[in-house]
C-alpha cells in the first residue's frame, strides 16, 4: 500500500508515476479530496473533544461551588453528539480512502522501462546461446507423453484441464529439481521453511493479492453455504505465507537481511488466460514452486534485488539452461513491485524464451499493508522492504530440461547437477505403462 502522505505532498509526481501503471489522475484527485475531508473532520473532532474536556471541568467546578450547571451539561450533550457524528464521518472517510489505496499499485522505480505492456520490456543480459539441434526439437508435452512420464489425459478426467500426473522418472525429476533448488538456496544463506498452504484474507491482503485479484485464486467455501466464502484461500505462491510470517512484527535491524525459502504447491485459477498455453506445463492450475523471500532494511533493498536475481540465475546456470534477464516495463510489472527482473529460459520447441522466475523489490509496499517494521540502532522504527523471487518454478524447469536436453531418439539426458538426486540416472528412457 502506498503512503497517503507521499501522494498528498507530491500529487503531480504521484500522478505521473502511476499513469505509467494505468492509473488515471482523477483517481488520485478523488483520493486526495477524501483525505482532505477526513483530516478536516478529524481536526474538528479533536477540537470538540478538547472543548468537551473544558466543559467537563466547568461542570465539575460548578458542582463544587453548588452552582447551576444545566447550561454546561446541555452544551456537553450537544458536543458529545457532534463528536459521535464526526467520528462516524472520519471512520467512513477512512474506509473510502483505504478502499482506493488498497487498489493502487506500487510506484515504479525510476529505472523501469516505461510502457503499457511486455513489448516494452528490456533485455538486461543473456547467459549462453539458445540450444540448437540437428533435428526438429519436440515440445515437452510430446516428450513427456511419449516417455510415459507425464499424463495430461488422465489428469483431465480426474481434475480437469491444466492438471497433470508426473509418473516414474517424471516424478523423480520433479522431486530432484525441487530438492536441488532448496539445497542451493540454503547454501546461499536462505533458511528453509515449510509454510501453511491455506491462508486467511488478512494474509492475502498483506502481500497484495486481495482485494484486487480475488478472481485469480481458489477460496474455500463453507460446506453448508457454498455462496459463503470461509476465511481461507489456497496460496498462489509461497510468497504469501513467507512474507506474512513477519506480519505485525518489529524486527531488530541487526537481524536483517532475513532470507527464507520454501517449496510449496501453488494454486491459480488463471482467470483471463483462456486459450493461452493450453498444452504443457507452462500454465497450470496447480504446480510446484520454490520461493525466495527477503526482509531487508530500506537502504539495502536495491542491492538485495541484484543478489536475489543472481541467486535465481545461479540455479539455471548450474542446470546448464540458456536464459536471459529482462527488466519489466511499468505496465508489465506486478501490482506490488517497484522493479521486477524476469528470468526467461530458452524453450527450443517454441523457439523463444519463457518466464521461469520473477524477482521483485516491493520496497515498503507490502510492509505497510502487513505492518512489518524494524528498529534501528537509535530506537527509531522503520517499515521494512520486502523482496521475492521464484527460485525457481519447478514445472517450468522440468519443461525446459525436457526440451533442452532431448535426444533424437526421444530420450532425455539428465543435467549433471541433478544426477545425484536421481539415484545416478543419466538418461530418462520410456517408462512402462501401468493401470492401463
Curated annotation (Swiss-Prot):
It comes from the Bacteria. Its main location: cytoplasm. Keywords: Aminoacyl-tRNA synthetase, ATP-binding, Cytoplasm, Ligase, Nucleotide-binding, Protein biosynthesis. It catalyses: tRNA(Ser) + L-serine + ATP = L-seryl-tRNA(Ser) + AMP + diphosphate + H(+); tRNA(Sec) + L-serine + ATP = L-seryl-tRNA(Sec) + AMP + diphosphate + H(+). Pathway: Aminoacyl-tRNA biosynthesis; selenocysteinyl-tRNA(Sec) biosynthesis; L-seryl-tRNA(Sec) from L-serine and tRNA(Sec): step 1/1. ATP binds at residues 268-270, 355-358. L-serine binds at residues 237-239, 291, 390. GO terms for biological process: selenocysteine biosynthetic process; seryl-tRNA aminoacylation. Consists of two distinct domains, a catalytic core and a N-terminal extension that is involved in tRNA binding. Homodimer. The tRNA molecule binds across the dimer. PANTHER family: SERINE--TRNA LIGASE, SERYL-TRNA SYNTHETASE. This is Serine--tRNA ligase. It comes from Lactobacillus gasseri (strain ATCC 33323 / DSM 20243 / BCRC 14619 / CIP 102991 / JCM 1131 / KCTC 3163 / NCIMB 11718 / NCTC 13722 / AM63). The gene is serS.
